[in-house]
Amino acid sequence: MGSLASEIPPHAVLVPYPAQGHVNPLMQLGKLLHSRGFYITFVNTEHNHRRLIRSRGQEFIDGLPDFKFEAIPDGLPYTDRDATQHVPSLSDSTRKHCLAPFIDLIAKLKASPDVPPITCIISDGVMAFAIDAARHFGIPEIQFWTTSACGFMAYLHHIELVRRGIVPFKDESFLHDGTLDQPVDFIPGMPNMKLRDMPSFIRVTDVNDIMFDFMGSEAHKSLKADAIILNTYDELEQEVLDAIAARYSKNIYTVGPFILLEKGIPEIKSKAFRSSLWKEDLSCIEWLDKREPDSVVYVNYGCVTTITNEQLNEFAWGLANSKHPFLWIVRPDVVMGESAVLPEEFYEAIKDRGLLVSWVPQDRVLQHPAVGVFLSHCGWNSTIECISGGKPMICWPFFAEQQTNCKYACDVWKTGVELSTNLKREELVSIIKEMMETEIGRERRRRAVEWRKKAEEATSVGGVSYNNFDRFIKEAILQHKTK
């Protein structure tokens, strides 16, 4: 992909939702646009701006001359805790309090002689206040939904669940009385779904629940944008993509997986844009280099999932008793309200076989030949990176559309198997052995490699996602620049 030759470069303002799983794909998009000659302004919240400085250093924030960082308040009380904030509070606050400071920022950028005129605003799909800001200034606005296409479609049907009387549930008994096994047969392009496969935010007894209302309303508001982009590829989610285009919007561009699309960017330049809010422990790569191909169980619950100390111990002894090498990511905040503490006898049992670190460069880990299976929460970043690496999955969804991604990984793409919510160590041992030692696991691995090859085809020169990215720049962005 060649860069754009122009005296005044196009200028994209990018606005991620303030969580690691949203900052990463927006940064990947910024990296891709920058490689095509765009000037980038990347807008974090003040809390995440501070975290990025701690993780990457002030020199990273100072950036390149044409890739700049700005920050706006999120409306929440100040905290210096190195963790993702409480998601419902954060979501409610961003939609209520971010519009005014964001408008002020856009006005400042427009008035500055040191930056090019703003060509477009590209905001996270759950930062839809940016649509109002863009309309205020007459700037094109593009929504980047960082979910899967099936997750996006599910959120668009929150209102239909209410209309049909399915949501809200009468009381909490629905969680264990079989109600969640009820078929959901009214979502176009998503056959064979059950309520348990829908995003977890539908599991409410009050439709005014913050996250149920937030995700449904943000999804519908995003349809007002000039275009929507998704970090997926057509062959992976063709049926639901066709349904979205037919029912809602034809201005949807599938431009992923980003992790493969960005391979055309020179490595030195690409490394300059890593956006982890935690410090990445690179010792894991050397550790993996010493392992046999397909021998390691990689475990990461993502940036938001929290577990109990009891669950931590079940995972620990399940991994230890499996007798397979493992790389386990244990964030400082992974245990609810406590520090993650494991007994000395666990460390003795896994000596020379297990590595525990707080955060890693996951894209590199999932591309490493030593990794044999990925135990994941099924967030979309992790899922699409896993597909891009050709790795099978052990799925343990936590919240949001992770349940939907798990359903597709296990039943549609056939690359995964699901763990029980109330996990016990014996089950984990059994599943790891199944995925690492049996024909079931080998078949899941073959399927994962097939999906990786299709992703590589989509993102190679002339592939569908590659061409869609070109079209996105020309149709959704640059045609407005000439007006």
Curated annotation (Swiss-Prot):
Swiss-Prot/TrEMBL catalytic activity: 2-hydroxy-2-methylpropanenitrile + UDP-alpha-D-glucose = linamarin + UDP + H(+)
InterPro entries, per database record: UDP_glucos_trans
Binding site for an anthocyanidin: 22, 400
Single GO MF annotation: linamarin synthase activity
Catalytic site: 22, 124
EC number of the protein: 2.4.1.63
Keywords: Glycosyltransferase, Plant defense, Transferase
BP terms from Gene Ontology: defense response
Any Pfam family: UDPGT
Domain of life per record: Eukaryota
Enzyme class, broadest EC rank: transferase
Residues that bind UDP-alpha-D-glucose: 146, 360, 362, 377, 380-382, 385, 401-402
Tissue specificity note: Expressed in the cortex, xylem and phloem parenchyma, and in specific cells in the endodermis of the petiole of the first unfolded leaf.
Function: UDP-glucosyltransferase catalyzing in planta synthesis of cyanogenic glucosides. Able to glucosylate acetone cyanohydrin and 2-hydroxy-2-methylbutyronitrile, forming linamarin and lotaustralin. Also accepts, to some extent, a wide range of potential acceptor substrates, including simple alcohols, flavonoids, isoflavonoids and other hydroxynitriles such as p-hydroxymandelonitrile, mandelonitrile, (E)-4-hydroxy-2-methylbut-2-enenitrile and (E)- 2-(hydroxymethyl)but-2-enenitrile.
Family label: Belongs to the UDP-glycosyltransferase family.
Name of the featured protein: Linamarin synthase 2
The species this protein was found in: Manihot esculenta (Cassava)
